[in-house]
Amino acid sequence: IIDDSADITLAVNSIIHSKTFDNGMICASEQSVIVLEKIYDAVKEEFANRGCYFLNEEETEKVRKTIIINGALNAKIVGQKAAKIAALAGVTVPEGTKILIGEVESVELSEEFAHEKLSPVLAMYKATDIEDAFSKAEHLIADGGYGHTSSIYLDIAKEQDKLKEFS
């Protein structure tokens, strides 16, 4: 979750570092990012400025069909570079693309982007407020397995109540 009090540059940098280390094979890397509506565009711009590629609707559908095959994670995407995954999906991305980002709405298991992807592929959700963000995060964790975790980027000095509610 990226709260509207967060240092956007720090949050985005941390997520990119996590998703690009070992091409996202570490299960502790972010699988989804939930961003408060108020800062969504600024976060999106920061990701784009740092070499992440936002898939359009048609490209999102192509990558969606590449993430999960016959109900299971497609082994061909695990630990691969973003450009290779894009090519597998029939999507052309700029050279040096770090992460493929699909902007999606559903946190249900029927949404392929809601699954663990073990690759530099990220789901990005817009939350209307912090309660909506918490709800989405809880749903993603419940469906993904309680062995997984969630994190929050916020201004810890100003947002103690949100941090307490999150934890």
Task: Tell me what each language-model feature is.
Residues 91-167:
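Conserved C-terminal structural/oligomerization subdomain of aldehyde/semialdehyde dehydrogenase
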Residues 1-108, 133-135:
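ALDH superfamily catalytic-core signature
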